């Protein structure tokens, strides 16, 4: 549904929400809604990641009768207070207060958490296997989201892994990403610590990094750890000047930073998981690496040593990003979903 059609039908609706993933919400806040975010002490707007839009309003509590729908956030860490107490309790408490409007929940994760979920499954009487851990997570997510209007996920594979969900693939606006002259550098940007080694592909990352340095003399720059970006401009400048971007993730659904790298004209080397092979064509607009650090390191090294080819692939990747991860399409997908939810609620 396009913006003009939605506004003619519903006018400027009011949405209740709260901070979660700043970069994702920066795009959501481009939707033609009146946004109200809850002030609390668990999640705050990340000014380093994105500037806060001026039209965003802040409220101290939820006021029944004031809003048209609520947009809340969850991920696999929220399935138990023992995993992430703050996020878990924030979701439960806020969700429990909202009874007069439909709730849409964005599930930002997948049930890939073998460090924790098999043990949780064992506590519930199952064998402590990774498969049972996924089953446990599916059930707990269904319990947590019972009664919500829709659960939105970030990849088609996430729908399969959770067993349900409405996929909306993220979208960006090409004008906001800087495709600059490239320096012969490889970078990555994944979570540096905490639970989630398989989810983020940290072992593949670290092993690839070691091989690159020892075998090829190449430094893999870890954004957020090796390179601190003071603000979004600094990040876009550094990413836009990087020749190669490496994405090692396994469970992360459609990693946003990989898409940002594609918009920035980087030559992307990525694992195939969560649908990357739907849009990356080997040697044309990027590279799909095996879950093998020797293979990923070789692909990266080949691109660092073949600057011209890497730039050409990066340009094809940018064309793909503009087509597949289009911001206008992202917003239209959201307007279509919100229209459906509001229509269904109106008929109750």
Task: Describe the role of every protein-language-model region.
Residues 37, 164, 171-232:
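Conserved catalytic-core segment of nucleotide-activated headgroup transferases in glycan assembly
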